[in-house]
Amino acid sequence: MPPRPFTALIVVLIALTTGGCASAVSAPLSAPGPSTSTSRSTSRSRTVSHNVITRVVTFVDSSRSVKYPHHHAIPRPLVTVIRYPAAVTRPLPLIVFGHGFAVTPADYHRLLTAWAQAGYVVAAPVFPLENAHAPGGPDEADLVNQPADMSFVITGMLALAAQRRSFLAGRISPGRIGISGQSDGGETALAMAYDRYYRDPRVRAAAILSGAELPNSQAVYFPRPSPPLLATQGTADKTNRPHFTYDFFRAARRPKYLLRLIGAGHLPPYTTQQPQLSIIERVTIAFFDRYLKGEPAGQAAMAKSGNVRGLAALTAAP
């Protein structure tokens, strides 16, 4: 039996994700993990909205632990919100998304839904100690553990897709995996794609939304080869200062793209602020279309959507 803080977190997340509706709860699903650990996954809910199915699944990494305040350490739970197109059964690219500090994937529901509507399976884990509902309050010291969380979710998602009776059976293309993240989730995704210590070679493209290099990182970023990069940044961001994004963008290898959101701040462009959110949706989809789906038109679509007078400017180094 998981400790009460973890159980409460699942209940809160389901309510935020499904609007309080937890229909069609399925039986537990098993998902084999990497050789150094075991994984368990449990489907918590299923809803359908805007032709996108949303499920909440819990992956458990028994090779690592987490300790909530006033509780003993337990295997690391990764409650994960999964979205995928309702009408598509062929293998699709996978995008794993990392949320920022003191929020949850629910805050980014419009962006993540747009990706799923565009033909992607989208998985967004809730980081155990950085999320808004973490017992005792969010703890940013856990940031260094999050790249491994996202890698573990990739492993769990591929395992589910390989199971004949899974709701994801045959829906994920293992060779077309992208990652993204915003704020601390952007730092997590950046490390997972480009930091030699955390790098996951399964990643084929990365969209870093107002992110930065991990604090006090001594690792070498952008070894050869490096996956294509899209970096986005609000020019008026006072939380993740623009130079953090500009610094890693300059160091990155081609192909790389920088989308500057003129006058935009830190979180709202990715959650509620318009028309910036719509610009983010179009540019990120075009980027993933180009580098995960192999669509040449994606590059022109990025330029068209990413250059909006007074709102956005795209720098491209293909």
What is the predicted role of each segment?
Residues 263, 273-318:
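Alpha/beta-hydrolase-fold serine-hydrolase catalytic core, especially in secreted/extracellular enzymes
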Residues 27-33, 40-90, 96, 121:
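Short conserved active-site loop signatures built around small residues
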Residues 225, 231-233, 237:
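Short beta-strand/loop motif that positions the catalytic acidic residue
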Residues 240-250, 273:
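Short alpha-helix in the alpha/beta-hydrolase fold that links the catalytic acid
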Residues 236-240, 266-267:
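Acidic catalytic loop of the alpha/beta-hydrolase fold
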Residues 88-92, 97-135, 238-241:
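Short substrate-entry loop that stabilizes the transition state in hydrolases
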Residues 100, 181-185, 189:
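Gly/Ala-rich beta-loop-alpha elbow adjacent to hydrolase catalytic centers
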Residues 107, 139-174, 191:
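Alpha/beta-hydrolase active-site loop
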